[in-house]
């Protein structure tokens, strides 16, 4: 009898515990789900948030649950506003997003938006950006005859556009804020109210602080390619640019790198710079190309 009773004890305990089963299930740890950092997207020249519907779809599909904010500021022609004005507007928009994400955020910034984002990382001493993904952005400036320029300045060519862009009036247009004429470097350094400052090419009181702020970033992901058709030279997306003979010098040959004026050399030394060149993609297709997303963007959205 004792043996039989001993065999029945486990069943008896199960019966006693049955009323408490719902409570036990509630107390059990939930299955682990990946929690992704919020993503902030900044558009480019003449763009709007609608242009990024495919990118939004890709992120939602591969990283479900990710909070993605495509900032709807300075759309269309408003994107011609001076870049410092845009930086201030975008700063006001990203501060509350970052405040709600103590684990950090990711930035995906397209074309002109990549320069806006780099300036944001420079002026914000409390940003928490993990990956700054610069998507086909003229990080070292622009020197090319594009349809945008022909529409805005129909009587000018790239060889004489410096006469407009390096004037106080010209600096009121965003395009001129990063116009970089390699044949008039002295004028660029003196007149550029934006690019020469965030590059640390011209002395200013905030240079040291801006460099320190920029170095808070976790990863700098640079994306571009030879078939872009707009960014000129296309290597500007990787901090390369023309010398006075219009020979492209790569990032490591640029003075801003050699002097580490805003932190590029430091970032590369710590393995924080990722370069992802891709051929066969035109400028307006970067944010909708699925292969590009899977290869160059998705791996950095932790």
UniProtKB/Swiss-Prot annotation:
It holds the Pfam family Palm_thioest. Keywords: Disulfide bond, Glycoprotein, Hydrolase, Lysosome, Signal. Optimum pH is 7.0. GO terms for biological process: fatty-acyl-CoA biosynthetic process. InterPro entries: AB_hydrolase_fold, Palm_thioest. One of its GO terms (cellular component) is extracellular exosome. GO terms for molecular function: fatty acyl-CoA hydrolase activity; palmitoyl hydrolase activity; palmitoyl-(protein) hydrolase activity; thiolester hydrolase activity. Residues 1-27 form the signal peptide. The keyword Disulfide bond applies. Glycans are attached at residues 60, 190, 206, 245, 289. Disulfide bonds join 109-117, 165-176, 276-296. This is Lysosomal thioesterase PPT2. The gene is PPT2.
């Amino acid at each position: 009898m004792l043996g039989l009773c001993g065999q029945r004890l486990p069943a008896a305990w199960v019966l006693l515990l049955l009323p408490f089963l719902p409570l036990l299930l509630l107390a059990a740890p939930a299955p682990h789900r990946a929690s992704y950092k919020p993503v902030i997207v900044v558009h480019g020249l003449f763009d709007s948030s609608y242009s990024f519907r495919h990118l939004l779809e890709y992120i939602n599909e591969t990283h479900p649950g990710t909070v993605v904010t495509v900032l709807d500021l300075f759309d269309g022609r408003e994107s011609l506003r001076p870049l410092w004005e845009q930086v201030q507007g975008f700063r006001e928009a990203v501060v509350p997003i970052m405040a709600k994400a103590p684990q950090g955020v990711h930035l995906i910034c397209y074309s002109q938006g990549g320069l806006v984002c780099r300036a944001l990382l420079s002026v914000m001493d409390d940003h928490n950006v993990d990956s700054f993904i610069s998507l086909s952005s003229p990080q070292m400036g622009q020197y090319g005859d594009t349809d945008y320029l022909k529409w805005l300045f129909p009587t000018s060519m790239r060889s004489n556009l410096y006469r407009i862009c390096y004037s106080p009036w010209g600096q009121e247009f965003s395009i001129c804020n990063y116009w970089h004429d390699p044949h008039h470097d002295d004028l660029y350094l003196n007149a550029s109210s934006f690019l020469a400052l965030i590059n640390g090419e011209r002395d200013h009181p905030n240079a040291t602080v801006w460099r320190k702020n920029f170095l808070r970033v976790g990863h700098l992901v640079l994306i571009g390619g030879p078939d872009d058709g707009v960014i000129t030279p296309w290597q500007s997306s990787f901090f390369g640019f023309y010398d006075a003979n219009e020979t492209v010098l790569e990032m490591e040959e640029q003075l801003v790198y050699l002097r580490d004026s805003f932190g590029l050399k430091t970032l590369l030394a710590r393995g924080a710079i990722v370069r992802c060149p891709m051929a066969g993609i035109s400028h307006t297709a970067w944010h909708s190309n699925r292969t590009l997303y899977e290869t160059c963007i998705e791996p950095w959205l932790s």
